[in-house]
Amino acid sequence: MLEKTIYRKLLSNAFDIPVSVTYWDGKTEDYGQGTPEVKVKIRQAFPLRELTSAPTLVLGEAYMNEDLLIEGDHAIQKLVTSAYRKSGSFLKKNSFLKHFPKMSHSKADSKEDIQSHYDIGNDFYGMWLDKTMTYSCAYFQHEDDTLEQAQINKVHHILNKLDITDGGSLLDIGSGWGTVLFIAAEEYGVHATGVTLSQEQYNYTKQQIKQRRLEDKIDVYLEDYRDLQGQYDYVTSVGMFEHVGKENLAEYFQTVKRLLKPNGRALIHGITGQHDGAGVDPFIIKYIFPGGYIPNMVENLQHVMDA
């Protein structure tokens, strides 16, 4: 009885929209004002200590195992958005974050993390990425742009900002499936070099280089970017620093500087948050982006200045 009382207290203040909750004993309670927009059914009680310390992981796994059922139009999106808006929601409290900065992120860890995410097969990513196989934020210049066009827009936007001149050298850190490399070499006249820890991405890029007959214009390496030598006129890194880990951010920006020629130019594109640990979530770390960390703007700017 005490367990359910605690559940009721937590859930009654978890969302800012009306929600109907059916508990494991079959009883239903409505929380919030108005007709429930979402119906939640909890088929069994979850350990309270785990629920309150890592709620997204516990509830995410429960949903996967069908111990938690959610009904309603765009129900999951509504619940997540509502929880983030709700002041004091237990779903935003996560003791997991306190331990995150202490997690190991060596070169071996980085390789394992990247391969666990990207080496599940190019066929899988090809099912839902656009034809360029670009796996980062797109730039929709016009409402009717396709995803493919928006990804191409993004690459041109990056390369134009670098004010590239013919004959220069460009390094793309975390080159993925090679889109930046191909466009830079074919349309901007540079010698492009890419580096990735993903065997699948490396194989795909090598194949594309051969098919496009760009062997004399593009190099790609399967290694840690920190092991690279030499210097380049331009350095790009798109959607990469989210993978390096909090404790390696300083080294990341220092490495970018080391690899850049004097008076060279770099463009770093990534996702940032407004506060420490933004975007770090135990469910995402376990199932989607192991080792991932979303830095805030202050962190990034400080590391750039220190480099």
Regions picked out by a protein language model, each given a short descriptive name:
Residues 177-188:
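Conserved SAM-binding loop of SAM-dependent methyltransferases across substrates and taxa
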Residues 263-271:
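Conserved beta-strand signature within the Rossmann-like core of class I S-adenosyl-L-methionine
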Residues 166-174:
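Conserved class I S-adenosyl-L-methionine
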Residues 226-235:
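A short acidic, Gly/Pro-enriched loop at the edge of an enzyme's catalytic core
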